[in-house]
Curated annotation (Swiss-Prot):
Keyword Cell membrane included in the entry's annotation: no
Compartments it resides in: Bacterial flagellum basal body
Coiled coil: none
Pfam families: FliE
GO cellular component, one term: bacterial-type flagellum basal body
PANTHER family, per database record: FLAGELLAR HOOK-BASAL BODY COMPLEX PROTEIN FLIE, PTHR34653
InterPro entries according to UniProt: FliE
Family stated for the protein in its record: Belongs to the FliE family.
Record-given protein name: Flagellar hook-basal body complex protein FliE
Keyword line: Bacterial flagellum
Keyword Cell inner membrane annotated: no
An example Gene Ontology molecular-function term: structural molecule activity
Length: 104
């Protein structure tokens, strides 16, 4: 008799788990595409370079409030972000070449 009650308890737990899984499936999942993320990253790199270039132009024109250390920091940030973008591109190209060389 206790074995039957144990089995019924397990069945109830499984049904509860199945119901919660169905509830989670019905929630809309945000769609984040790889292409969208890549485009956003490229935009951030471009924005960083534009900001650094603007700071350098302001410093060159001797505008008040623009210090050399700010310009150097912005230029270094732009350089690092560009190098990161290049490395990501290199990894993507290497992965693409590896996939293309696989035999089907």
């Amino acid at each position: 008799m206790s074995a039957i009650q144990g089995i019924e308890g397990v069945i109830i737990q499984l049904q509860a788990t199945a119901m919660s899984a169905r509830a989670q499936e019905s929630l809309p999942q945000p769609t984040i595409s790889f292409a969208g993320q890549l485009h956003a990253a490229l935009d951030r790199i471009s924005d960083t370079q534009t900001a650094a270039r603007t700071q350098a132009e302001k410093f060159t024109l001797s505008e008040p409030g623009v210090a050399l250390n700010d310009v150097m920091t912005d230029m270094q940030k732009a350089s690092v972000s560009m190098q990161m973008g290049i490395q990501v591109r290199n990894k993507l190209v290497a992965a693409y070449q590896e996939v293309m060389s696989m035999q089907v």
